[in-house]
Amino acid sequence: MTATTAPRLKTRYREEIAGKLREEFSYENVMQVPGLVKIVVNMGVGDAARDSKLIDGAVKDLTTITGQKPAVTKARKSIAQFKLREGQPIGCHVTLRGDRMWEFLDRTLSLALPRIRDFRGLSPKQFDGRGNYTFGLTEQVMFHEIDQDKIDRVRGMDITVVTTATNDDEGRALLRHLGFPFKEN
């Protein structure tokens, strides 16, 4: 039987980052220190309204990237201008928690983001007011798991990092300590 090891980023958070954040914001209680709750990876496939086979490629890509089978998002109501019917698949999303979340975040920060051409850093203004951060990626090729020769088309995705931070400053400090490459104004 092999012993399971904690993800690298999770260990760093517990040993170094939590202590730094506690000093920085002078928390009384250890439970006040912000941490990660979940990461939601969403891939909208608007063209799936016209061609239903496109959703299969998105599901396959997301499964390969995250290691978890995505849930297919369906249209809530019909919209004639978009040629959209209620119940039609229009995207897929994955919610990552626990060790899978830490592993995915580590891979994204250390491998995927540096592979983006002309990458200048993530915008520090994309927080939602409650310490959660959302950023978009324009193509799925930046992940090593995706074989460039086998993709049927380029798909972007939204990645939302949900934290226990109460405001944007705490969330920004947490993500900066975790290694998010924010742009300096």
Curated annotation (Swiss-Prot):
It holds the Pfam family Ribosomal_L5. It comes from the Bacteria. This is Large ribosomal subunit protein uL5. HAMAP family: Ribosomal_uL5_B. One of its GO terms (molecular function) is tRNA binding. PANTHER family: 60S RIBOSOMAL PROTEIN L11-RELATED. This is one of the proteins that bind and probably mediate the attachment of the 5S RNA into the large ribosomal subunit, where it forms part of the central protuberance. In the 70S ribosome it contacts protein S13 of the 30S subunit (bridge B1b), connecting the 2 subunits; this bridge is implicated in subunit movement. Contacts the P site tRNA; the 5S rRNA and some of its associated proteins might help stabilize positioning of ribosome-bound tRNAs. GO terms for cellular component: ribonucleoprotein complex; ribosome. Part of the 50S ribosomal subunit; part of the 5S rRNA/L5/L18/L25 subcomplex. Contacts the 5S rRNA and the P site tRNA. Forms a bridge to the 30S subunit in the 70S ribosome. Belongs to the universal ribosomal protein uL5 family. GO terms for biological process: translation. Keywords: Ribonucleoprotein, Ribosomal protein, RNA-binding, rRNA-binding, tRNA-binding.
